[in-house]
Amino acid sequence: MITAAVGALKERGGSSRQAILKYIQANFKVQANPAA
């Protein structure tokens, strides 16, 4: 999931943790876990 998120975001300087989390929540069936 993480590699798919980083590949899809295509951010030049790397993807932030928040951006990866937002992408995963939007595109995969996962429960929102604020501790993650």
From Swiss-Prot:
The lineage of its organism: Eukaryota, Metazoa, Spiralia, Lophotrochozoa, Mollusca. Residues 1-36 form the H15 domain. The keyword Nucleus applies. GO terms for molecular function: DNA binding. One of its GO terms (biological process) is nucleosome assembly. Sperm. It comes from Ensis minor. Keywords: Chromosome, DNA-binding, Nucleus. The keyword DNA-binding applies. GO terms for cellular component: nucleosome; nucleus. InterPro entries: Histone_H1/H5_H15, WH-like_DNA-bd_sf, WH_DNA-bd_sf. It is found in: Nucleus; Chromosome. Its main location: nucleus. Belongs to the histone H1/H5 family. It comes from the Eukaryota. It holds the Pfam family Linker_histone. This is Histone H1-like protein EM5. Coiled coil: none annotated.
